């Protein structure tokens, strides 16, 4: 992982473009914020379930990774919900869905794929709309989440590639 001299933004980085074959359903910034909260809520619940499965399967370090990313998704939810509440007072966050973990290697791949989607498709699409609408707060929280999701994907792939290393 490389450190940078400046915080990446859509203005100074080249990996904020929206993919040509985007599968993200894009709405207004408010709709996108709500979609992000809903998606992150599901991801957080899924990662908590994956942590429990990893622990049960004897992968304690990977369980901690899933616990940490579940907690990180809660930070994204809080930031996004905070911007929603400024636009729509009284907004209530969605309830976390039921989630279940499966084999740890498959959970890592599914997690990485979800994070790659968010960092390469969903958040760039949402950032573009926030910029068009002039919503700097939404642009900031979407950008922060986008950058974090890239790190999560990298961590999941590293764990997947090293799942049978003797340290876990």
Language-model features: locations:
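Non-heme di-metal
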Residues: 2-168
């Amino acid at each position: 992982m490389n450190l940078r001299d400046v915080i990446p933004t859509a203005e100074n980085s080249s990996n904020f473009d929206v993919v040509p074959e985007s599968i993200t359903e894009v709405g207004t910034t408010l709709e996108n914020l709500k979609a992000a909260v809903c998606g992150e809520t599901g991801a957080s619940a899924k990662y908590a379930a994956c942590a429990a499965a990893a622990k049960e399967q004897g992968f304690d370090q990977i369980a901690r990774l899933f616990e940490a990313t579940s907690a990180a998704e809660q930070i994204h939810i809080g930031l996004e919900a905070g911007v929603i509440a400024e636009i729509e007072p009284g907004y209530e966050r969605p309830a976390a869905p039921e989630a279940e973990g499966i084999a740890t290697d498959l959970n890592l791949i599914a997690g990485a794929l979800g994070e790659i989607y968010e960092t390469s498709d969903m958040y760039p699409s949402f950032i573009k709309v926030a910029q068009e609408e002039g919503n700097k707060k939404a642009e900031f929280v979407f950008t922060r989440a986008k950058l974090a999701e890239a790190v999560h994907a990298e961590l999941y792939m590293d764990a997947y590639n090293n799942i049978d290393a003797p340290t876990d």
